[in-house]
């Protein structure tokens, strides 16, 4: 029968195998085995972790940059045009951010101001906050009220100008009524404004009718004239007489306290008589007719101002009347009587250069101390009635002896 060694106890003769003690295991070095195994797994794990970290980081950075660029583009679109025009060329990101910041600050200041105004309006205006504005507004209101009151007073006085028993209480009542109408809205204000205007329009046509009547009557002598007046007429009478604004006729009428059209009617009659007498003396009217002297009838209407003034004196608007040499040639002796009667009271004192034989004859007709120049009439002539009737035969003889005029004669 075979022996099973596992079932049998160990033989006692065999020596016991020495066991491994803890002290012996502690002295053994297993570092090389452990180090090789750990390094392989650590390297593999670190490489995988780095790859997995780099991929999300790049995506995150890209997304962040895309968001920044998108926001800057939107800000660029939202910026006002006047801010965009401040820079030239392409707007960079930094420029867009600066302009956005500037615009936001301006909007913030504006919102703050509006907020302050709203708070001030809600809480009521404090005393002294807007003192300057209140003062200006008060002055404007006072000026407008004063002008309105003055206009109403003037219109009321113009409306009741002919009323003698006008009282101040009536004016005050009228002003109170106007104030009440203004407070109600001024709907009934328009009839009050139109009433004084109607009164003024009624008064103006009457005044214009009087004014048109005056100039029309004063201009009657001018219309009836059949020949053009000369400069002597303007120097002899006031030019305002024909224009209807007064003159010597009106001065004389004010003294006598009579209507001017009465004296003007007499003047028309006198002028008509004078024109008819002139036409009877000469068949054809002279080319130039001037009132260089006044008859007794004309002097009655002209007044003392004209007679006191120098006869044919210098007029501020008219040069003195001159007679050139060539107007009266020696062969024109037939017209001398007409000249004597029409425009010169006495014999015609015409001097020619080189006049020897007629000097004595002419000196007898003229005053030695008032000898006129060859071209200018005397400044002061005596009245035609003061002179005796002088015969012009001597003057005619002297003029016949005058040789023909020389073209080189000097003035």
UniProtKB/Swiss-Prot annotation:
Q: Which residues form the Orange domain?
A: 142-175
Q: Which residues form the bHLH domain?
A: 52-107
Q: In its keyword annotation, does this UniProt entry include Nuclease?
A: no
> CDD domains from the entry?
bHLH-O_DEC1 (cd19749)
Expression induction? Stimulated by retinoic acid (RA). Expressed in a circadian manner in the liver with a peak at ZT10.
Cross-link type Glycyl lysine isopeptide (Lys-Gly) (interchain with G-Cter in SUMO1, SUMO2 and SUMO3), placed at: 159, 279
What is its subcellular localisation?
Cytoplasm; Nucleus
Record cross-link Glycyl lysine isopeptide (Lys-Gly) (interchain with G-Cter in SUMO1), residues: 279
Q: What GO CC annotations are associated with the protein? A: cytoplasm; nuclear body; nucleoplasm; nucleus
What Gene3D superfamilies does the annotation carry?
A: 6.10.250.980, Helix-loop-helix DNA-binding domain (4.10.280.10)
Q: Which GO terms describe its molecular function?
A: DNA binding; DNA-binding transcription factor activity, RNA polymerase II-specific; DNA-binding transcription repressor activity, RNA polymerase II-specific; E-box binding; MRF binding; protein domain specific binding; protein heterodimerization activity; protein homodimerization activity
Post-translational modification comment from the UniProt entry: Ubiquitinated; which may lead to proteasomal degradation. Sumoylation inhibits its ubiquitination and promotes its negative regulation of the CLOCK-BMAL1 heterodimer transcriptional activator activity.
Which keywords does UniProt give here?
A: Biological rhythms, Cytoplasm, DNA-binding, Isopeptide bond, Nucleus, Phosphoprotein, Repressor, Transcription, Transcription regulation, Ubl conjugation
For this protein, the record's InterPro entries field holds: bHLH_dom (IPR011598), HES_HEY (IPR050370), HLH_DNA-bd_sf (IPR036638), Orange_dom (IPR003650)
Renumbered to this chain, region (Disordered) spans 1-20, 227-294
Give me the ranges of the annotated region Necessary for interaction with RXRA and repressor activity against RXRA.
75-79
Phosphoserine-modified residues are where? 235, 383
Q: What does this protein do?
A: Transcriptional repressor involved in the regulation of the circadian rhythm by negatively regulating the activity of the clock genes and clock-controlled genes. Acts as the negative limb of a novel autoregulatory feedback loop (DEC loop) which differs from the one formed by the PER and CRY transcriptional repressors (PER/CRY loop). Both these loops are interlocked as it represses the expression of PER1/2 and in turn is repressed by PER1/2 and CRY1/2.
Describe the protein's quaternary organization and the partners it interacts with.
Homodimer. Heterodimer with BHLHE41/DEC2. Interacts with ubiquitin-conjugating enzyme UBE2I/UBC9. Interacts with HDAC1, SUMO1, RXRA and BMAL1. Interacts with TCF3/E47.
Would you tell me the protein name for this molecule? Class E basic helix-loop-helix protein 40
Which gene holds the coding sequence for this protein? Bhlhe40
């Amino acid at each position: 029968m075979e022996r099973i060694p596992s079932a049998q106890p160990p033989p006692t003769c065999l020596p016991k195998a020495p066991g491994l003690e803890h002290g012996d295991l502690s002295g053994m070095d297993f570092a090389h085995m452990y180090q090789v195994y750990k390094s392989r797994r650590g390297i593999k794990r670190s490489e995988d972790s780095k790859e997995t970290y780099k991929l999300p980081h790049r995506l995150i950075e890209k997304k962040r940059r895309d968001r920044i660029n998108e926001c800057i583009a939107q800000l660029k679109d939202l910026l006002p045009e006047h801010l965009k025009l401040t820079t030239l060329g392409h707007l960079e990101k930094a420029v867009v951010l600066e302009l956005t910041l500037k615009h936001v600050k301006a909007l913030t200041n504006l919102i703050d101001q509006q907020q302050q105004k709203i708070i001030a309006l809600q809480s009521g205006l404090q005393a002294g906050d807007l003192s300057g504005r209140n003062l200006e507004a008060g002055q404007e209101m006072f000026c407008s009220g004063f002008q309105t009151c003055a206009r109403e007073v003037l219109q009321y006085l113009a409306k009741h100008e002919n009323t003698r028993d006008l009282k101040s209480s009536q004016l005050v009542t009228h002003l109170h009524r106007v104030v009440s109408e203004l407070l109600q809205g001024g709907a009934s204000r328009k009839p009050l404004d139109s009433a004084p205007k109607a009164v003024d329009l009624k008064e103006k046509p009457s005044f214009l009718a009087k004014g048109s009547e005056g100039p029309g009557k004063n201009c009657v002598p001018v219309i009836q004239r059949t020949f053009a007046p000369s400069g002597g007429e303007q120097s002899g009478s006031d030019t305002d007489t024909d224009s209807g604004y007064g003159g010597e006729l009106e001065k004389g009428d004010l003294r006598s306290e009579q209507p001017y059209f009465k004296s003007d009617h007499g003047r028309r009659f006198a002028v008509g008589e004078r024109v008819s007498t002139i036409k009877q003396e000469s068949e054809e009217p002279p080319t130039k007719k001037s009132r260089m002297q006044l008859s007794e009838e004309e002097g009655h209407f002209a007044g003392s101002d004209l007679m006191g003034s120098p006869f044919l004196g210098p007029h501020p608007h008219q040069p003195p009347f001159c007679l050139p040499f060539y107007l009266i040639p020696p062969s024109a002796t037939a017209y001398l009587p007409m000249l004597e009667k029409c425009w010169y009271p006495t014999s015609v004192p015409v001097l020619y250069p080189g006049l020897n034989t007629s000097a004595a004859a002419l000196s007898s007709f003229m005053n030695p101390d008032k000898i006129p120049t060859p071209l200018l009439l005397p400044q002061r002539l005596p009245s035609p009635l003061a002179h005796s009737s002088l015969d012009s035969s001597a003057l005619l003889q002297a003029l016949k002896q005058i040789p023909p005029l020389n073209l080189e004669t000097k003035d």
